[in-house]
Amino acid sequence: VTFVENHDTEYRSASEQQDPIRKDTLAANAYLLAMPGTPCVFLKHWQKNKAAIKSMIEVRNMTGIHSQSMVYNMSNLYNLYAASVTGSDGKLLVAVGPNAAAYAPGSQWVKVLSGNKYAYFVENTINRPWVDLASGSYPNAQRVTLTAISDNSAAKLVYTTDGTTPTASSKQAGSGTTLDIPEGTTVLKVGLLIGNTVSNIITRNYT
């Protein structure tokens, strides 16, 4: 079991401060959720950063990271730590530190998430579509980014926003396309399009 904070270390009061994480909470969780083990997210971190942490969990699940996944260190500098982790379904690369946003690991890696001092990349051989905003309830309109994680340079994305299954004749988008999701209920479905074949459709439910 792995964790970055719990009730024994969290800040409680000025007279009972304990040993909390005082900054870079999301970067710490990004590292935790990319590494082997059985990660446990602190409830208060989840409540404060639900969408971001849920997306990290979805990347972990998509690549099949598990308790015995192999880790390969790619950078171990004072301002950047990066490692690739091999899951049962693909490889996830996590970068953390002040230089994480600028890290460019190579053409076989596709960036799928980024934030303050962290970034997630997935190896392109996984051949899957990706949407960076997790399913959930949001108080306002949102913007999502669609990404084609593929080693085929001709790969595109097809999508629907009414819950129907996308086909080769559905709306198409290139990797990196952004969509505006209106306030209210939207069921977004996205598939990877290579030639005339749509595969690995994913669903996001927004309310």
Where are these regions (language model features)?
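Carbohydrate-interacting/catalytic domains
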Residues: V1-D132
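Short, compositionally stereotyped local motifs that mark structural "simplifiers"
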Residues: T125-T207
